[in-house]
Each structure stands twice: as C-alpha cells, then as structure tokens.
Amino acid sequence: MKNILVCTIIRNQINNLDRWWHQLHELVAHCPEYNFTFSIFENDSTDGTKEWLVKNLSNQENVVFSSVDIGTRQYGSVWSVDRIKNLAHYRQKCLNQVNINIFNKVAYIEPDIEYDAKWCSELINARHPAQLGIVPDIYSAWALRSLNNPKESAFLYDTCATRQTKDDLVWNFESESKWRRETVQPTDLGGADSNCLHTLYSTFNCFCVYNSEAFKTKSSQSEVKWGYTNKGLNTNQTSFRDHDNNISWLDADTAVICEDFREKGYNKIYINTNCLVRHL
C-alpha cells in the first residue's frame, strides 16, 4: 500500500463541510491502493466550522487538524499580497503537522468545490500518465467557475496558477485552443476517457496532487516549502495593484510551488481536463 496525505485549509466553510467530507470518503473508495491521512488547518472561523471539525473529526484516527485564532483578515478569490502570504503559511502548516517522510503523494483539495470522485480519483491513481510510462510530479484537475454566474461557468476558475508557459502571468484564454491541440498526450482508457492529459507550466485548480519527495529534506538539497516571491515576474513591464490597491506583486503561492518543483528537477507537470471540479 502507498500513503497519501490530503491537505485542506479551511475558514468559514460550514455550508460546504458535509459535502467536502463526503466527497473525500468517496475518493478513498476509488483509490484502493492508498492509505489516506488528512491534514487540516483551520483558522478564525466564526460560522460553526470549528465546532463541526471538533465534532466530526476529533476521534478519526487518520485525521490531524489544527484550529487556531490568529486574527488574519479573510479574503475572497482576489489577488492580494496579504492573502498570498497567509495562504502559503496555511498550506505549509498542513505539512508541518505530520511526518512527511512516510507519504508517497500529497494532495491539496479545497473545501469549496464539487467533483465526481470516480473521475477525480485519476489524479491520485494516475493511470493516464502510467500509459506513457510517466510518474507525474504535479497532477491537477481542471476547475470551472461557479454556477452562480452562468455566463462564466464554463470558463477556467484558477487563472492565477494555471499557466501554459513560463512567460505567462495568468491563464491565456486567447491561446487556450492552441494549447489544447499542441499539448495533448496520446492516452486512452476507453470512450470519453481519452486525450485529456496535457502538459503545462504550472497548475493548482483546487485539487492538485504532488510528488511528496519534493517536500522531503535530502542530503543533496533542501525541501520545497510553500512560499511567495517576485521571481520570474518582470515588474518593469507590469503596473499592478492588488486587492488593497498596493502597487506590488507577489506571485501566487500555487504557481511558485510549481516553479520551485521545477528548480529541484520535479518538472513533470500535468493537468487532466476530464477531471472536472466546480468551484462553489
């Protein structure tokens, strides 16, 4: 059996927690070759999330969770320097509270998404890459926008971290069709489950699986940690104000982690356009 760590950071998600936990149980059922451990970091919730976690997860043997009040500001899905720093800190907390050395894979799964566990189990089982003799270092879903905005619901949600090339700062919708044609990998698991594997520069998309080796300390190199940086961004060509009107740019932590993986030699990054998740 292989071991996978599933990480989730949570704040004020009471309306989504039952769905989130139920989907994770379904995911376990579709990944029989893996032992699952769940690492959860919650902070500053005021809507009953803390109480739900204590009631439902306290006695679970395969769950590790922290619940703290640190007084940070809560943001929505916006690009903010402060938010990026906080998210990187929270995601790293999920790794710090376990022994990472016992895991083969690490998955980050957001609490406010909906997905078909049978289809998305591919991200853990990685059968499409296996057809090509590939063990992916990063393998993600394709996240769609909320149905609350029907006109936008067919578009990619994670435009910050999903990038076709190193030079992109966000998702390039204009070249998406070309990207789909040129990056598709020839795999076929039958019927519609084919020609859905693509290469790209970086990704997250609310459900992302990582090679755990990158997070482990080795004698030859230090481990990858969640962080933030201006690395790779030419700010002389970009006038950018964040959500709080600050003139600055910190690249998304979910894009930075991909670049850090690449620098350590973990450069097999894929996305599966059949593994659809819906942001709620």
List each model region and its residues.
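Active-site-proximal specificity loops/subdomain of glycosyltransferases
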Residues: 52, 56-103
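Short, well-formed alpha-helical segments that are part of the catalytic scaffolds
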Residues: 13-29
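C-terminal catalytic/acceptor-binding lobe
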Residues: 189-280
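Phosphate/oxyanion-binding active-site loops and adjacent basic polyanion-contact surfaces
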Residues: 13-17, 83-91, 249-254
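A conserved acidic beta->alpha catalytic loop
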Residues: 14, 41-51, 70-72
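Short beta-strand-to-loop acidic/aromatic patch adjacent to the donor-nucleotide binding site
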Residues: 101-114
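Conserved catalytic core of nucleotide-sugar-dependent glycosyltransferases
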Residues: 113-230
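Hydrophobic targeting segments
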Residues: 2-8, 24, 36-40
